[in-house]
């Protein structure tokens, strides 16, 4: 979606509308490295009667604490939350990717995956994934090690991915399509050898085929390159939301891989993201002489009195000001903002 900053050009509402028009009963969001759009996506899809699958295309490096230019991007990996526990675990990993792993991009590592894998479905991703990268570097043994590692962690919730983007452009096809054909062949062999299911997927960055040119301009903005630069980054123009019929035509020999995508959708539960406001608890001093039921509100009143008197000083005896202060406190009590007041006081206290 557009939440993959300067990389995705699919607005959420039109994306959901298009998915529904194509007869899809579920759709996933996997923005690059972030979860900025999950609430908007979840609400929009739910309202439209399409099951929202919340995920992220994370960047995985060997050690998230090391800031090494050789690993500034990391390998791509798809993580999907199949239940609320998985959603919370994904939120934790993505948060750590920013607070601990950020270096050019938000990055996680396998230590985090081991720690927070519960409730998550894992897919091997595009050509930027660790398995495809090993295959493209002719290191099949490494690809096998990676597959085994992820299968040991995720079990039946680990899936290998097949992708095909035939553009008809010889230059683009040489860079992407030919590599995809080679990678897919080995992935099918690895899937059979290690008993891992595989899916057919499409790397969606925009909604309709005719949106490809606009997306191409967006990539130029992202990379700071001119449109007529022959060496700039180019997509295949196949990265749109394809219909089930188009996907079946791309993979006529693997209908089972298309069906497996529905298996993933069925695994993902419906869960709500809304809840009551979460406010921290700020216990007043132990020697504060008020009954427990009145404790926090009374402590806040004491703070307000002291601060208001300090602000208005000698003018506190003016009846108009006293009435204004009383009205402000009455409104504060009505809105039950005592906890919030303690929270803001804690943030600004020196």
Regions found by a protein language model. Give the residues of each.
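Phosphodiester-processing cores and adjacent nucleic acid-binding clamps
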Residues: 1-350
């Amino acid at each position: 979606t557009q939440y993959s900053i300067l990389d995705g050009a699919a607005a959420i509402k039109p994306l959901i509308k298009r998915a529904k028009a194509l007869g899809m009963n579920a759709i996933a969001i996997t923005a690059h490295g972030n979860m900025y759009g999950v609430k908007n996506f979840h609400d929009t899809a739910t309202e439209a009667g399409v099951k929202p699958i919340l995920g992220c295309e994370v960047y995985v490096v060997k050690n998230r604490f090391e800031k090494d230019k050789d690993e500034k991007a990391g390998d791509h990996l798809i993580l999907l939350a199949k239940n609320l526990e998985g959603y919370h675990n994904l939120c934790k990993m993505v948060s750590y990717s920013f607070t601990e792993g950020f270096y050019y991009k938000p990055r996680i590592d396998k230590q985090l995956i081991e720690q927070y894998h519960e409730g998550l479905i894992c897919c091997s991703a595009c050509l930027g994934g660790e398995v495809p990268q090993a295959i493209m570097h002719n290191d099949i043994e490494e690809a096998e090690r990676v597959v085994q590692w992820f299968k040991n962690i995720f079990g039946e919730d680990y899936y290998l991915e097949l992708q095909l983007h035939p553009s008809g452009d010889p230059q683009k096809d040489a860079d992407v399509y030919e590599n995809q054909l080679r990678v897919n062949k080995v992935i099918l062999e690895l899937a059979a050898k290690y008993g891992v299911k595989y899916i057919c997927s499409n790397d969606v960055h925009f909604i309709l085929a005719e949106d490809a040119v606009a997306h191409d301009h967006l990539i130029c903005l992202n990379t700071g390159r001119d449109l007529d630069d022959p060496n700039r980054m180019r997509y295949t123009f196949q990265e749109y939301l394809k219909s089930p019929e188009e996907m079946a035509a791309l993979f006529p020999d693997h209908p089972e891989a298309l069906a497996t995508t529905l298996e993933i959708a069925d695994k993902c539960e419906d869960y709500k993201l809304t809840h009551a406001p979460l406010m921290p608890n700020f216990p007043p001093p132990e020697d504060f002489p008020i009954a427990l039921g009145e404790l926090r509100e009374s402590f806040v009143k004491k703070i307000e009195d002291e601060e208001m008197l300090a602000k208005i000083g000698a003018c506190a005896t003016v009846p108009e000001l006293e009435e204004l202060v009383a009205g402000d406190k009455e409104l504060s009590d009505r809105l039950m903002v005592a906890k919030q007041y303690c929270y803001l006081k804690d943030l600004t206290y020196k």
